[in-house]
């Protein structure tokens, strides 16, 4: 297996698909990286030369991926919480941040249902 940005990428798949195993690289970015490295997107990882892998690694090093990207995202969320912006408050309370309604659903963000016992009549 070839290692790019600390991730073992599958050898049998095309380079564009394999690059998407790295956190922070999607299909569009993977295509740009392959084009920049002068590698055909159809090439399988096992068929790449060491020189081509080296070029791809150098290009990927210019992007924020894996741990650096995760760290930056966490710091951004912490900053929002520290300045007590609306988005930061929603993050702190574990509620949807982007304006979704919460009366009925939002179960992914709110967690499992906390059942409240009915008042006996």
Swiss-Prot record:
A Gene Ontology biological process in which this protein takes part is:
translation
tRNA-binding recorded as keyword: yes
Against Gene3D superfamilies, the record matches this protein to: 1.10.8.50, 30s ribosomal protein s13, domain 2
Look up the signal peptide feature and give its range.
Answer: none
Keywords, comma-separated and alphabetical? Ribonucleoprotein, Ribosomal protein, RNA-binding, rRNA-binding, tRNA-binding
What's one Pfam family the UniProt record gives for this protein? Ribosomal_S13
GO MF term set: rRNA binding; structural constituent of ribosome; tRNA binding
Location of region: Disordered: 91-121
Q: Tell me the InterPro entries matching this sequence.
A: Rbsml_uS13_C, Ribosomal_uS13, Ribosomal_uS13-like_H2TH, Ribosomal_uS13_bac-type, Ribosomal_uS13_CS
The keyword Protease is annotated on this UniProt entry: no
A Gene Ontology CC term for this entry?
Answer: small ribosomal subunit
State the protein's purpose. Located at the top of the head of the 30S subunit, it contacts several helices of the 16S rRNA. In the 70S ribosome it contacts the 23S rRNA (bridge B1a) and protein L5 of the 50S subunit (bridge B1b), connecting the 2 subunits; these bridges are implicated in subunit movement. Contacts the tRNAs in the A and P-sites.
Name the family: Belongs to the universal ribosomal protein uS13 family.
The subunit structure is: Part of the 30S ribosomal subunit. Forms a loose heterodimer with protein S19. Forms two bridges to the 50S subunit in the 70S ribosome.
Task: State the name under which the record lists this protein.
Answer: Small ribosomal subunit protein uS13
Tell me what organism the protein belongs to. Answer: Staphylococcus saprophyticus subsp. saprophyticus (strain ATCC 15305 / DSM 20229 / NCIMB 8711 / NCTC 7292 / S-41)
């Amino acid at each position: 297996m070839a290692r790019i940005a600390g991730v073992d990428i599958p050898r049998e798949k095309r380079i564009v698909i394999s690059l998407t195993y790295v956190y922070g690289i999607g299909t569009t970015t993977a295509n740009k990286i392959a084009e920049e490295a002068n590698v055909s997107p159809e090439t399988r990882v096992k068929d790449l030369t060491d020189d081509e892998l080296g070029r791809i690694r150098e290009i990927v090093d210019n992007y924020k991926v894996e741990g650096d990207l995760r760290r930056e995202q966490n710091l951004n969320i912490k900053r929002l919480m520290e300045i007590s912006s609306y988005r930061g408050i929603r993050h702190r309370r574990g509620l949807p941040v982007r304006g979704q309604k919460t009366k009925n659903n939002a179960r992914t963000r709110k967690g499992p249902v906390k059942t409240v016992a009915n008042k006996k009549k």
